[in-house]
A protein has these predicted regions:
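A detector for small-residue-rich transmembrane helices and their helix-helix packing motifs
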Residues: 1-256, 260
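Structured cytosolic domains appended to multi-pass membrane proteins
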Residues: 256-270
Length: 270
């Protein structure tokens, strides 16, 4: 039994942060599935899902995050995790893991806030009546829009066509607008919360501001067991190619991003 536990720990330690999130989402889904099978529709999952009632959210503030780990069907879970997996890998190639993880988590929180605010600010009857909010879609969409806003003019090839990322982002947002008037209007509202967060994060990050910096300490344990991040040791008056260390690092990182995206733009997705 001890060797089995060690084997599981070793395998988990090799996963990146997004693979761990996928594992966590899958475990929670299986737990909820079993609970519903045993207790039927009487299974109470309100302590994890996000209510549209402001008073309930105030009494269970953790649900602003935990709702992102609950999914109401296998298809719902599957598509969110597939998108998260591929975009998580793309983010890991372009940015440090802590940046992509902060975008994802803040996207979930922003989507949750948007959902609760909309149903408490707009008069009843404007939005369709919905139950509790579940799903990681807001976090996933925040990641997509972050990438599109951070590198808007980079072109990605789809079959025989090439599109700038900014147009792909606009198309995704426009495609979600009809959902605001559907039976799943609550979910679409959360999506737009993720869109806004992703866009705002990217525009600030382009200016050198990391709006998710306050999460660094909270998320530090994710990076300990995943691939180590680069450590920068500050030295006084050091220069690299006539530039300060920070300027040189920024320049080099941008060049790496350009090289990766040039490869993506040339090879494309077919």
């Amino acid at each position: 039994m001890t060797s089995l536990n060690q084997d599981i720990r070793e395998k988990l330690s090799r996963l990146n942060v997004f693979e761990k999130i996928i594992v966590a989402n899958t475990i929670v889904y299986l737990f909820c599935f079993i609970a519903l099978r045993i207790q039927g529709s009487g299974a109470n999952l309100e302590w994890l899902s996000l209510s549209k009632s402001a008073s309930e959210v105030l009494s269970k503030p953790w649900t602003l995050l935990t709702y992102g780990f609950i999914h109401n069907s296998f298809i719902h879970l599957f598509f969110n995790m597939v998108i998260l997996y591929f975009f998580g890998r793309s983010f890991s190639n372009l940015f440090k893991q802590d940046i992509s993880l902060k975008v994802y988590i803040l996207g979930i929180l922003s989507g949750g806030f948007a959902f609760v605010l909309a149903y408490n600010l707009f008069p009843s009857g404007i939005l369709n009546t919905v139950g509790a909010l579940v799903g990681a879609s807001a976090g996933v969409r925040a990641m997509i829009i972050f990438l599109c806003a951070y590198l808007p003019n980079k072109e990605v090839r789809f079959f025989t066509f090439q599109f700038p990322l900014k147009y792909i982002g606009i198309a995704i947002v426009l495609f979600d607008i009809p959902g605001l008037f559907s039976q799943n209007s609550g979910g679409s509202i959360a999506h737009f919360g993720g869109y806004l967060l992703g866009y705002f994060y990217a525009t600030q990050f382009n200016k050198g501001n990391d709006i998710g910096e306050f999460l660094n300490r909270i998320l530090s344990y994710f990076s300990r067991s995943s691939s180590p991040l680069k450590t920068v040791h500050k030295k006084k008056k050091n220069s690299f190619a006539g530039k300060k260390k920070e300027e040189f690092d920024t320049f080099t990182h941008q060049k790496q991003i350009d090289l990766i995206l040039d490869k993506i733009g040339k090879s494309g997705y077919e």
